[in-house]
């Protein structure tokens, strides 16, 4: 059962669902809009070896970031010209990780799904790849996987980037996501790189 606007207000007001900060203007007919935070991660690897920790740069923006397609030519001159013309803090090409401003806590009988905004789809910008699912019992901020597929796109801190759709399960989970022993991203309060290498460590323990 998907929660409607009335349900979302009810769950938030009764503290069954926590969204912090919460803005009543961001409640849609059956979704809640979330906004872009200031922290990002850009991987440094030429090849992703998923059995190893992935080296990366973590950085913050004050106002805006330009995201370019992977094959978009950038050199120092172009970067400086872009910064001067568009007044952006940072310019990157290829994919990067971001995070929402919103911290979310779900009970064991509510799960959620993140979807990018249709307006972003119309400029060929994707803000999640395969990681839109949020298990019941999750506590933390939502990670964004950001890729521009056509032309460079300028994103602004605090702008709405997507929405959460909440669903109520038939019965509560015995153990919610953040209480599971092997949950890798429980309680995340800033952008986090992939911890998939821990899957192999877990498999070796079993």
UniProtKB/Swiss-Prot annotation:
Its EC number is 3.5.4.30. It is an enzyme of class 3 (hydrolase). GO terms for biological process: dUMP biosynthetic process; dUTP biosynthetic process. It catalyses: dCTP + 2 H2O = dUMP + NH4(+) + diphosphate. The record marks 132-133 as: Important for bifunctional activity. InterPro entries: dCTP_deaminase, dUTPase-like_sf, dUTPase_trimeric. Keywords: Hydrolase, Nucleotide metabolism, Nucleotide-binding. The keyword Cytoplasm does not apply. DCTP binds at residues 117-122, 135, 143-145, 163, 177, 184, 188. It comes from the Archaea. The active site is at residue 145. One of its GO terms (molecular function) is dCTP deaminase activity. Pfam families: DCD (PF22769). Disulfide bonds: none annotated. Pathway: Pyrimidine metabolism; dUMP biosynthesis; dUMP from dCTP: step 1/1. The keyword Hydrolase applies. Homotrimer. Belongs to the dCTP deaminase family. Bifunctional enzyme that catalyzes both the deamination of dCTP to dUTP and the hydrolysis of dUTP to dUMP without releasing the toxic dUTP intermediate. This is dCTP deaminase, dUMP-forming.
